[in-house]
Amino acid sequence: MTMSVNKSTLVLKVGGALMQCEMGMARLMETAAKMIASGQQLIMVHGGGCLVEEQLTANGMTTEKLDGLRVTPQEQVPVIVGALAGTSNKILQGAAIKAGVTCVGMSLGDGDMVSAKVKDPRLGFVGEVSPKSATYLEFILSQGWMPIVSSIAIDAAGQLLNVNADQAATVLAKLVDGKLVLLSDVSGVLDGKGQLIKSLNRSQVEELTNIGVIEKGMKVKVEAALEVAESMGQPVQVASWRHAEQLIALSNGEAVGTQIQPD
């Protein structure tokens, strides 16, 4: 299959809520199949917060968060790895295969894609990753396959680390010089009245964070988007998987959801 070289790779980050919505997954994967057939290279990066919560509860464990980031104590690592690199990854792979997408399920630990280290000892086994080698990803993309990547990384000492999926997607977008799209179950960043904000830069984000309009999970998402927008000098989209068909417009250069702008 010959791939078009003029479209940059789209890195789609999806959240755990998608996996609880079969129709949403089906629509997203059907859209992905159309985009890949038209020569668009896609990488999907996923979290799986809801599944992680379910598994922790089933194991009698509780979740603690610090500034919107999950704290990962040693005893929770096997459960979190199983929920993310195992169940969540394979649920998405199943939906992709059903829609006719040839995909490769993997984690951040594969193919020397990233280097990983502990982010902050207060967060336990939470990792921070930086881009390393694009060779493995580029080979998979060159075949017309879609990588589906869980946010589990492995450091140089072999320690498994839980990485925030928004940060994971940011690093993979840098690695392949692609466009980052953060998909969640809301259509983008909403103002205090629930209206979609079409475009934001750093000073506007800081202002909305200070008055409590952007908080918790959306704060982490917007900060990840700002980081990649500024380091790559191009806008990042925050949009909804509920309107997957909009991604085709995005791949044609149109704006959807909220555009996070580099200053």
UniProtKB/Swiss-Prot annotation:
Binding site for substrate: 48-49, 70, 162
Major subcellular location class: cytoplasm
One GO CC term on file: cytoplasm
Catalytic activity: N-acetyl-L-glutamate + ATP = N-acetyl-L-glutamyl 5-phosphate + ADP
Site (Transition state stabilizer): 13, 221
Listed EC numbers: 2.7.2.8
First-tier enzyme category under EC: transferase
Annotated metabolic or biological route of this protein: Amino-acid biosynthesis; L-arginine biosynthesis; N(2)-acetyl-L-ornithine from L-glutamate: step 2/4
Keywords in alphabetical order: Amino-acid biosynthesis, Arginine biosynthesis, ATP-binding, Cytoplasm, Kinase, Nucleotide-binding, Transferase
GO annotation terms (biological process): arginine biosynthetic process via ornithine; L-arginine biosynthetic process
Annotated SUPFAM superfamilies: Carbamate kinase-like
Compartments, as annotated in UniProt: Cytoplasm
A Pfam family that the UniProt record links to this protein: AA_kinase
Family under the similarity heading: Belongs to the acetylglutamate kinase family. ArgB subfamily.
Name of the protein described by the UniProt record: Acetylglutamate kinase
Biological source species: Shewanella sediminis (strain HAW-EB3)
